[in-house]
Amino acid sequence: MRGKEFWIILAVVLILSAIIIPIPALLLDLLLTLSITFSLTVLLLTFFIKNPLEFSSFPSVLLLGTLLRLSLNIAAARRILLHGHEGTHAAGKVIEAFGKLVAGGDVVVGLIVFLIFIVINFIVITKGAERISEVAARFTLDALPGKQMSIDADLNAGLITEEEAKRRRQELEKEANFYAAMDGASKFIRGDAIAALIILFLSLVGGLLIGIGIRGMDLASAVKTYTILSIGEGLASQVPALLLSTAAGVLTTKMSSRENLGEAISEELTKQPRALLFSAGVLGFIGLIPGLPTLPFLAMSAILAGAYYLVQQSLKERELKELEKLAQEKTKEKEEEGEELIPQPEPITLEIGYALIPLVDESQGGQIPKKIKNLRKQIAKEYGVIVPLIHIRDNLRLKPNEYRILIKGIEIDRYELMPGHYLAVNLGNAKGPIEGIETYDPAFKIKAYWITEDKKEEAQKLGYMVVDAETVLITHLSEVIKRNLHELLTRNEVMELIEMLSKKYPKVVKEIVPEQVPISIIHRVLQNLLREGIPVNDLLTILETLADYIEQTKDPDLLTEYVRQALSKRITRMYLTNGTLYAIALSPKVEAKLVKFLKENREDEFIDYVLNTLLPKIKNEIVKFAQYGAVPVLLTSGEVRRFVRKTIEPYLSELAVLSYNELEKQVNIKIIGIVDED
């Protein structure tokens, strides 16, 4: 158990002990003083904090303070009833002093003053603090969903990071818990005020009965003694109660700001100094009315007039400082003219026309931000990389229903939606035409039609894939991101991935990175894999493979081939159709010719041969994959794979080029075409 926890538990035990065990008058004085000190400290603390959540333990503090006062009430009542006949000092000096001070030698006056004090505490302060707590709790809880949606919207729009969103959600949860707890804690104060009245009555009546009936005191002496003691006891407990009630009210009415309460009130009251001047004039006029006391009103009028003068001087000084600051800023701007920093482009940006704003505005029912959040999670899970925040903004230069997707500030693609319509996409198995506006699917560039909702069921029956406008945008965005993951992967993100892996395999990562394999090579290899759509989830295998071959070569492209072989099972299964790998292959003659070009460093001839001789034949063979419903795959030897892929990528990006070395041994391969030069 930690020291702080021990002292809290010990304090609670001692407070509860005071209820049962009789305590001497001196110790009671010390404890009553402690109660007042504790309450005063809490009150002053609420004045200096700037945010109520800085004192989130206040409800618990309030409970402990109430428990302390009640235990002292019981202890004091016990001493009054047992030792009251000994005199007003029987319950200690603190209670005696409070009782005599208020009573002023007249017990009736003392009782009336005490009751007034109780009324002020119970009806004004306590009742007000309780109501404030109830309203604050209700409005805080009512606003909770809206605040959560606002955080999600800021996150989806890229205005805040994941860490900032998490921190805000935690603060929101803490705020809701705080005000809910304050609503309940305010009941402690109210009950404490009621208990004070009951204890006063019991102490007074019980004391009189014991003093007169048992101790043999005369009526006048008993009334005076027990009234002073009862009033003193009540005040000694109600003064700290009043302080804590005020603290509760101050805390629940405090708004979050950069200033403490004193600074906030001072600044706001002095914003309009004319109010001080008018008040001074009114008080001066009242002071001159015959029959009214002149000195107090004129004195207060003079004080307010002086305050007005001082505030005016302060405002003038503040304005001068602001003007000087503005002048300095302008000078600095002139000095830095022509040296402005060029802002870095956002990794991913979605720009929309004004008519598409409802699709991205969650307050209007737009689902795009939520779907984008899910999309980032899905891609991260599928490919093992961190997808950057996607920034959404409107662009008045676009058509009303148009959007465009930018990667690092460069436009990758754009498309025009038809909100309220559905996109019917012909995947090749549609049984007939459908009435609609002819267009294409932006993600896969397949022929499609915009149809109205009443045609949706008909299109589905004909074999069309039917999706709404939001899904079209999200699918398009998804494909653009997947095709550009290699560009989005930065070295910083690679280091983050390695750091996450090190939490699970610290020794392996420490041994490999960066002692054996530098970050730059890991970055290039991961980019190469992502460029061809290979997930990098299995980062451990990738690092271990790089460590095995780094002594043989430092070429990232060649190292990528070794990594692909290590990931053979994963790569093979990406392209299986019903357990079979359908592929076209290069003929032995073509393979031999390509290898010869590479060995003789005849790269220009290699490229010319692939583009002019092989590419047309590859395109002719690719059409065969449709009848099998398979992903197009070209098989080559390991020596030429990466060079063939690099050459044909701009023309056939959807064609996967695999080498025999990176295929799973037990895989069932079906060659459906041979690429030959004849």
UniProtKB/Swiss-Prot annotation:
Tell me the membrane topology, using the record's own terms. Answer: Multi-pass membrane protein
Entry GO terms, CC:
plasma membrane
What is the first-listed, main subcellular location in coarse terms?
A: membrane
Question: Which parts pass through the membrane?
Answer: 8-28, 29-49, 57-77, 105-125, 194-214, 231-251, 275-295, 340-360
**Which top-rank group of organisms is this from?**
Bacteria
Q: Where in the cell is it found?
A: Cell membrane
Gene3D superfamilies recorded for this chain?
FHIPEP family, domain 1, FHIPEP family, domain 3, FHIPEP family, domain 4
UniProt GO BP: bacterial-type flagellum assembly; protein secretion
Q: Which InterPro entries match?
A: FHIPEP_1, FHIPEP_3, FHIPEP_4, FHIPEP_CS, FlhA, T3SS_FHIPEP
Family of the protein in this entry: Belongs to the FHIPEP (flagella/HR/invasion proteins export pore) family.
Q: What does this protein do?
A: Required for formation of the rod structure of the flagellar apparatus. Together with FliI and FliH, may constitute the export apparatus of flagellin.
List the protein's name.
Flagellar biosynthesis protein FlhA
Organism lineage reads as: Bacteria, Pseudomonadati, Aquificota, Aquificia, Aquificales
Query: Encoded by which gene?
Result: flhA
